[in-house]
């Protein structure tokens, strides 16, 4: 079972390493070698650590951090959903996504959005997200990647 905890600034390097491993393993074939190298260069202190101030979470299995996920409340956007390669296909990504959606529901957010990497579109579709049009993602670091903007309506429980 995945234990999910809120990330702290001290978790930035751990989260960055999960991201790097996941991209290098799961995005091969969807993006060029040059894009992959640019995407995974650097270190957490290059700006990734600032994400820890948002609704950023780590997923743990037997004391090991194996997944990350974030909900940007300013944009109702899901992001940074990564799972270590050795743990993919076991439902941990879905569990983290469900957690992020639950956080959104608790804040009465009716729809969440995301920019799916080309290799992750079918995963998100399987989780109820819709979107087909390919677009271009511009990262804060200047990286340009093809993506598919997707959205999911959430059922928000009325207050009683």
What are these regions (language model features)?
Residues 65, 131-133:
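Residue-level detector of beta-propeller blades
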Residues 1-3:
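Extreme N-terminal starter segment of soluble prokaryotic enzymes
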Residues 110, 114-121, 127, 137-160:
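C-terminal "cap" of GNAT-fold acetyltransferases
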Residues 44-47, 135-139:
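Short, P/G- and charge-enriched loop/turn segments at secondary-structure junctions
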Residues 6-12, 17-86, 97-99, 103, ...:
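Acetyl-CoA-dependent GNAT
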Residues 84-88, 115-117:
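Residue-level recognition of the GNAT/N-acetyltransferase active site
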